[in-house]
């Protein structure tokens, strides 16, 4: 059974707008609350049930909006409250960046079901647990804030590049082809013999 939608009157919308305090500190705490909720949802989606693409997209979009808002907002004068109880050294942007990378990775790993009827079976709903090494790398600063180009700097492309075999340059004619030079004629005659045989 689906839920019923309730329509707001114009008066209710005005009252709701008046309730919100959009001062910098209130906005910062609102963003941190959204981040915590998104983190909880990401951690719950790594559980034994099948991940939902719609949920990943919603969380991904929320985190991108938060990251964009944080980059544009000036730094607060007060120190922000810790994001994690045991890991206070993480910055907000590093955390958001790692979550976005983890979401992208998990979305890439998801494969669409080949048969829609087969996807509803209980066996297909059980997904293996996430790799602990992957989660450890995700929770640490292993990936950091490096850009996409930084990942490709160490790749050796020399084996991929096509070596074009150019013929060796011809020696200048002034060295060997001087008029009356018997060496040039001798070499030319030897080449004719080799090619002719």
Curated annotation (Swiss-Prot):
The keyword ATP-binding does not apply. GO terms for cellular component: cytoplasm; nucleolus; nucleus. InterPro entries: SERTA_dom, SERTAD3. It is found in: Nucleus; Nucleus, Nucleolus. Disulfide bonds: none annotated. Keywords: Activator, Antiviral protein, Host-virus interaction, Immunity, Innate immunity, Nucleus, Transcription, Transcription regulation. Residues 27-74 form the SERTA domain. GO terms for biological process: innate immune response; negative regulation of cell growth; positive regulation of DNA-templated transcription; regulation of defense response to virus; regulation of DNA-templated transcription. Residues 1-23 are annotated as: Disordered. Antiviral interferon-stimulated protein that plays a role in innate immunity and in the suppression of viruses through different mechanisms. Plays a role in the late phase response of TLR-induced immune effector expression. Strong transcriptional coactivator. Interacts with RPA2. This is SERTA domain-containing protein 3. It comes from Mus musculus (Mouse). The lineage of its organism: Eukaryota, Metazoa, Chordata, Craniata, Vertebrata.
């Amino acid at each position: 059974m689906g839920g019923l939608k309730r329509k707001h009157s114009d008066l209710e919308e005005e009252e709701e707008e008046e309730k919100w305090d959009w001062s910098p500190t209130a906005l910062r705490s609102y963003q941190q609350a959204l981040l915590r909720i998104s983190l909880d949802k990401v951690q719950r989606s790594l559980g034994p049930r099948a991940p939902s693409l719609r949920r990943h997209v919603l969380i991904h979009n929320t985190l991108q909006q938060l990251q964009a808002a944080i980059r544009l907002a000036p730094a607060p004068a007060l120190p922000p409250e810790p994001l994690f109880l045991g890991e206070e050294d993480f910055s907000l942007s590093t955390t958001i960046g790692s979550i976005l990378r983890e979401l992208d990775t998990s979305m890439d790993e998801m494969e669409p079901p080949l048969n829609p009827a087969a996807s509803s079976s209980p066996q297909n709903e059980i997904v293996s647990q996430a790799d602990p090494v992957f989660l450890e790398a995700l929770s640490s600063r292993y990936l950091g804030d490096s850009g996409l180009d930084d990942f490709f700097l160490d790749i050796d492309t020399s084996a991929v590049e096509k070596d074009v075999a150019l013929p060796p340059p011809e020696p200048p004619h002034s060295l060997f082809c001087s008029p009356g030079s018997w060496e040039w004629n001798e070499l030319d005659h030897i080449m004719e013999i080799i090619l002719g045989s």
